[in-house]
Amino acid sequence: MRVSRNKLILSVLLISLALAGSASASSVTMTYQGHQGVVAKDGSPYIGYPYYVSINGSATLTPLMCDSYDNNVSLGQTWNATATPLLQGIANSMFGPAMTLDYKAAGLIFKSMLGGQMSTTAAQWAIWGLFSANASSNAYFISKNFGSIDAAYLTLAATASNSAFKGLVLYTPTGGRPGVGPQEFIGYSPVPEPGTLTMMGTGLISLAGFIRRKLARS
């Protein structure tokens, strides 16, 4: 009987820990499904965002922003990646922690685009330009002055609070590096407030204590 009680309590505690750690890194399988009818805009030579991807075989496609201009994926290609909250994922990202400010700027640009504050074309090229000299020296990039967007958002990123990056997810391809392997992507996935996760975890731990006391009386 004691073994069963201990197993029950342990199970509840493990559930609470899993919930508390739900925002950590996870390994995923990604399959590129194209742009789903979206076309290049404003004279851009490339479509860019959105790259629609099936994650772990899901029939619901996820629209993602590419940050690696010099890498490529082909329609139907499948690869493994690590999905991590943006700030946490920078340490093991494609471009590394030396580019932390650039990743932060990319995250802010992406959120601004999602909020309707800039076009998808401008956001895509600005993010490409942060990480690739080939992108930032492209005639189209220069003609549209996307470098001014980068400069503005690098300044914003320098003082932005961590909460500004909430919900951003970095998808880093396994074994990928600049110019080699699949692209790295940034996505957005609303997550529960940290306080909510803490309350859920605390509640489950309290429940475990309650169960333990009830079992002790039986």
Model-derived segments and their meaning:
Residues L8, S74-G76, T198, S218:
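A broad, structure-centric signal for solvent-exposed, well-ordered loop/edge residues
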